[in-house]
C-alpha cells in the first residue's frame, strides 16, 4: 500500500482543494497521502494547516508534532507548530517553537531559508506576550510564570541565580552568557515568561 508516487499525487490534490477553500476535502487527501508515505513530514504539516483552517487545533498540533518526529530537521514543521500554538493563545510555547525553527534553519544545509518568516513569528509572539502582560503587575507576572515548572526550576538553579544578579548591575553581561546555548535557552525562557524584561 505504501506508494510515494501516489502519496505525492494525493498531497498535490490536497493542495489544490486547500487553495479552493475545501478544507475537509484537503484533510482527506492529505490523510491518504500520509497513509501512502508516512515517512514524508510534508503530509502532516499540510494536514495541520488544513486542520488549523477548520479550527481543529489539537489535531493540528498533533500533526505538527508528528511531522517533527518523522523529520526533526524539517523547519516548516516548527513554523506550523508555532502558528498552531499561537492560535491556541499558547504564546510562550509558540515562541519556543519559533526559536527552535530559527536554530534548525540556521544550521540547515544551504544556509537559512526561512529567517524572514521566522523573525516575523518571533515578533508576533513577543508582541502577544507583551500585550497579555501589559495589565499585570510585576508580582502577577512572576506568580503566573512560576506556575510553569520549567520556569520555577530555572529560577532555583544557582548558576542562573548568579547570572540574573550579575545582569541587574551589568545588563551587558547577559549578552556574553547568550553565547552558551544551554544558558541561552534558559534566558529565552525567562524573557518569554516575562521575568526578564527586554523593554
Region locations from a protein language model:
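Alpha-helical tetratricopeptide repeat
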Residues: 1-199
Amino acid at each position: 500500500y505504501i506508494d510515494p508516487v501516489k502519496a505525492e499525487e494525493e498531497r498535490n490534490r490536497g493542495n489544490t482543494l486547500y487553495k479552493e477553500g475545501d478544507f475537509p476535502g484537503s484533510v482527506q487527501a492529505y490523510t491518504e497521502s500520509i497513509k501512502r508515505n508516512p515517512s514524508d513530514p510534508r503530509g502532516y504539516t499540510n494536514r495541520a494547516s488544513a486542520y488549523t483552517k477548520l479550527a481543529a487545533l489539537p489535531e493540528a498540533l498533533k500533526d505538527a508534532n508528528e511531522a517533527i518526529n518523522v523529520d526533526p530537521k524539517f523547519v516548516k514543521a516548527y513554523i506550523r507548530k508555532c502558528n498552531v500554538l499561537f492560535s491556541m493563545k499558547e504564546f510562550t510555547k509558540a515562541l519556543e517553537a519559533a526559536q527552535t525553527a530559527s536554530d534548525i534553519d540556521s544550521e540547515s544545509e544551504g544556509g537559512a531559508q526561512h529567517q524572514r518568516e521566522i523573525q516575523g513569528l518571533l515578533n508576533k509572539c513577543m508582541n502577544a506576550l507583551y500585550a497579555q502582560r501589559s495589565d499585570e503587575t510585576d508580582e502577577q507576572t512572576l506568580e503566573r510564570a512560576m506556575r510553569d515548572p520549567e520556569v520555577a526550576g530555572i529560577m532555583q538553579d544557582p548558576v542562573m541565580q548568579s547570572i540574573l544578579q550579575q545582569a541587574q548591575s551589568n545588563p551587558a553581561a547577559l549578552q556574553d552568557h547568550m553565547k552558551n546555548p544551554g544558558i541561552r535557552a534558559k534566558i529565552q525562557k525567562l524573557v518569554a515568561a516575562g521575568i526578564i524584561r527586554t523593554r
